[in-house]
């Protein structure tokens, strides 16, 4: 029996060492990590489409019934419109867009965490973050930010060094959260990868690598300027590989992560929908206030490859990034309420009819990656830092980065246009 136990232990150790040679290998570790992320994005892109379309249809039917009920109760028209076109439609869009990708992404991410792979990702990222003047634990909080930036900011409490913790908090919003992923996926599919979900997954992977590079760059700048210091030692005990309990993981991730993020977004989206409805139905100089605001912002947005409607949609989408696209559609179509599209083809036709090109889409992708954190993340940053100064800096850093990159991108497009024979 003793010999048998020893042989079993030897087999387990050998298996772990073999896996670690691949997962932690100098030439194999990073490619495996990138392929896993690309696979997760591909599953999320493919799997979220049909449930999202079904939920959009379902909520549209419920909205029709709700409108009929309010009409039967003789509710005043303005109040009925406020409840259905303002609050309800905003909430239904957020749920239909957020829930399907979250229901896929969070369990997949949790499986990687449960089987012991995520600490090995942190091991790979430790060298990168050390060169940026921080520690590998920031890599874990960066991974957490893929699900929710607010959760990533809260997770920064695991970093012992106050300086490195603050850097991690200030740069966490450079990672695209689950609220931004549907918009990124939609734009990538419509303008850059209409014929291949595999190519769309790799474009998403490139965007993720781009955002990670920006995180490292800004972290390095902070550690060499206002937050100087030496990186602390990073002690990481690699856990053994475990067979994940798939059923328990799915239930737990949906309950503790997906529903938590969704409920928080709903709480924020309801008053946001009311505010947007007021702007849409208040007239100034014979046009809705919201369109007047978009016209005012147009000259400011043009140098960055966007129009006033795009910039205003991002501003009004501060409570929840999920409502940026429907806000754009509402203003482009002048419907007075947020519009739902049945498929990407219809959405693409509307955007191109309003002047969108692939250059516009590229600028919106960059600005989606790098702009101010959502309201929930801002509140979380203030709670974690206890400082308005650091909260404002956490807002300014990604915003300035986004505007700068969009401006540089436009200059690149102008240079390319001057040499059509080459390009």
Please report, for each region that a protein language model flagged, where it lies by residue:
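Switch/coupling subdomain of P-loop NTPase systems
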Residues: 1-20
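Transmembrane alpha-helix detector for multi-pass membrane proteins
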Residues: 100-112, 118, 133-191, 368-379
């Amino acid at each position: 029996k003793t010999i048998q136990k020893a042989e079993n232990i030897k087999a387990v150790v050998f298996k772990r060492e073999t896996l670690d040679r691949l997962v932690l290998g100098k030439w194999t570790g990073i490619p495996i990590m990138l392929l896993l992320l690309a696979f997760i994005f591909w599953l999320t892109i493919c799997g979220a489409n049909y449930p999202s379309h079904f939920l959009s249809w379902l909520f549209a039917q419920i909205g029709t019934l709700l409108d009929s009920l309010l009409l039967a109760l003789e509710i005043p028209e303005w109040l009925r419109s406020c409840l259905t076109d303002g609050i309800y439609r905003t909430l239904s869009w957020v749920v239909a867009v957020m829930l399907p990708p979250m229901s896929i992404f969070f369990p997949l991410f949790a499986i990687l965490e449960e089987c012991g792979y995520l600490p090995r990702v942190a091991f790979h990222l430790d060298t990168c973050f050390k060169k940026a003047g921080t520690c590998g634990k920031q890599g874990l909080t960066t991974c957490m930010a893929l699900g929710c930036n607010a959760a990533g900011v809260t997770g920064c409490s695991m970093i012992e060094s106050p300086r490195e913790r603050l850097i991690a908090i200030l740069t966490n919003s450079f990672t695209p959260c689950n609220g931004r992923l549907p918009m990124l996926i939609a734009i990538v599919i419509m303008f850059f990868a209409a014929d291949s979900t595999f190519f769309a997954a790799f474009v998403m992977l490139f965007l993720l690598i781009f955002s990670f590079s920006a995180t490292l760059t800004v972290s390095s700048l902070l550690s060499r300027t206002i937050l100087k210091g030496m990186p602390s030692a990073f002690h990481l005990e690699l856990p053994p590989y475990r067979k994940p309990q798939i059923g328990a993981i799915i239930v737990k991730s949906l309950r503790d992560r997906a529903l938590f993020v969704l409920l928080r977004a709903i709480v924020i989206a309801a008053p946001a929908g009311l505010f947007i409805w007021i702007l849409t139905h208040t007239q100034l100089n014979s046009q809705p206030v919201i369109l007047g605001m978009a016209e005012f912002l147009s000259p400011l947005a043009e140098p960055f490859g966007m129009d006033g409607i795009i910039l205003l949609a991002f501003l009004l989408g501060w409570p929840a990034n999920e409502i940026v696209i429907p806000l754009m559609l509402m203003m482009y179509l002048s419907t007075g309420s947020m519009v739902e599209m049945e498929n990407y083809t219809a959405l693409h036709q509307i955007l191109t009819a309003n002047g969108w090109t692939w250059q516009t889409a590229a600028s919106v992708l960059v600005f989606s990656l790098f702009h101010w954190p959502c309201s929930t993340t801002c509140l979380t940053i203030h709670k974690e830092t206890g400082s308005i100064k650091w909260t404002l800096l956490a807002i300014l850093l990604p915003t300035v980065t986004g505007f700068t990159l969009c401006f540089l991108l436009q200059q690149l497009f102008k240079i390319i246009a001057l040499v059509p024979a080459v390009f």
